[in-house]
Swiss-Prot record:
Disulfide bonds: none
Family, similarity comment: Belongs to the class-V pyridoxal-phosphate-dependent aminotransferase family. PhnW subfamily.
EC number: 2.6.1.37
Gene name, Swiss-Prot/TrEMBL: phnW
This protein's name: 2-aminoethylphosphonate--pyruvate transaminase
Length: 369
């Protein structure tokens, strides 16, 4: 039986070429593997348009490991971090800062509202002690896109440092670090680059990284030490996820051959457009307004029907070969459908047909939205 298609924001469906790259074993101290790491890091900085101002620090583990590493390394103990909060991944940053003992100020927004740059500036006026902003660029709990450029500009005007969780946007949406004033951008292998999970990375401004020595309370999650060792030896400090990096190298080769960010973003946008139009034809209503919807994952209102049960619905769609994501909102019954991975609009149309059949199997009659 073929593997199901993952309609999730990561892990996601990968190409056969990417999976095949993991068939080779690598020595973690071998020169060939060191060259592999260096080539991956160079491409990641180039994709971010970082130029010579920025370096890539790879980190073992999920993307959250790298988010915690960046916060723990780049924010000094007496720093104060403003966290615009419009979803679960913003809340996770607040939890990380709490565990690190770093003072944090939450700036709440609705789950269906993008962060407002003017509200961020107003927070600077109310709380002049703020030193940093930690922004989730694409809040995947709903699929909402936050205005990175406007917030980066506000931070520059007020002399605040900006750390960006670009976990679900990097590689698909345009981001240019050069002259942005952003201290760090964090993402991971298993998202829009279409690698496999297991490696995060921070693309960090050199001067911010140089100034961070001794900040981190963690040995393993110290970005400064990780990069210093990598620069000195070409090696990771601790055992690297060798097969993950090999898969990412293959995924990056395919990414560049496809046409880089513009082409990857266009394919995902086509997937998203096809998904929303086809789901509306079935009767499903997107949670977000189109003006703030990112082309990565779409949240839909669940059917308002007593026969609806997410587990039975999920199992029926899973049986047809597609894996969905549960909702992650606090106040509404929803589910999510991803638009990313090694998939195209044809896969999306087949998935929507499976969703329609699943709803029908539950005895739910829907009308076009």
């Amino acid at each position: 039986m073929p593997a199901p298609i993952l309609l999730t924001p990561g892990p996601l469906t990968t190409s056969a070429t990417t999976r095949h790259a993991m068939q080779h074993d690598w020595g973690s101290w071998d020169a060939a593997f060191n060259q592999l790491t260096a080539s991956v890091c160079a491409d990641l900085v180039a994709i971010a348009h970082g130029g010579d101002e920025y370096v890539c620090v790879p980190m073992q583990g999920s993307g959250t490991f790298s988010v915690e590493a960046a916060l723990g390394t780049l924010v000094p103990r007496d720093g104060v971090v403003l966290v615009p909060d419009n979803g679960a991944y913003c809340a996770r940053i607040l939890k990380i800062l709490g565990r690190l003992g770093i003072d944090a100020i939450a700036l709440p927004f609705g789950e269906d509202a993008a962060v407002d740059a003017a509200a961020v500036e107003a927070a600077f006026a109310r709380e002049p002690r703020i030193t940093h902003v930690a922004l989730v660029h694409l809040e995947t709990s709903a699929g909402i896109l936050n205005p990175l450029d406007a917030i980066a500009a506000a931070c520059r005007r007020h002399g605040k440092r900006l750390i960006v969780d670009a976990m679900s946007s990097f590689g698909a949406l345009p981001i240019a670090l050069a002259d942005s004033g952003i201290d760090a951008l964090i993402s991971a292998s298993g998202k829009c680059l279409e690698g496999v999970p297991g490696m995060g990375f921070a693309i960090v401004r050199r001067d911010a990284l140089d100034a961070s020595e001794g900040n981190s309370p963690s040995l393993a999650l110290d970005l400064h030490d990780q990069y210093a060792y990598l620069r000195k030896t070409g090696q990771w400090r601790f055992t690297p996820p060798t097969h993950v990096i090999a898969a990412l190298r293959a995924a990056l080769d395919q990414y560049l051959a496809e046409g880089g960010q513009p082409a990857r973003g266009a394919r995902y946008a086509d997937n998203c457009r096809t998904l929303v139009e086809s789901m509306r034809a079935l009767g499903f209503v997107p949670f977000l307004d189109a003006s703030v919807q990112a082309p990565v994952i779409v949240t839909f209102h669940a059917p308002d029907h007593p026969a609806y049960d997410f587990r039975r619905f999920y199992d029926a769609v899973r049986g047809a070969g597609f894996i969905l994501y549960p909702g992650k909102l606090t106040r509404l019954e929803t589910f999510r459908v991803g638009c990313i991975g090694a998939i195209d609009a044809g896969d999306i149309r087949r998935a929507v047909a499976a969703i329609g059949a699943a709803v029908e199997s539950l005895g739910i009659a829907m009308q076009p939205a």
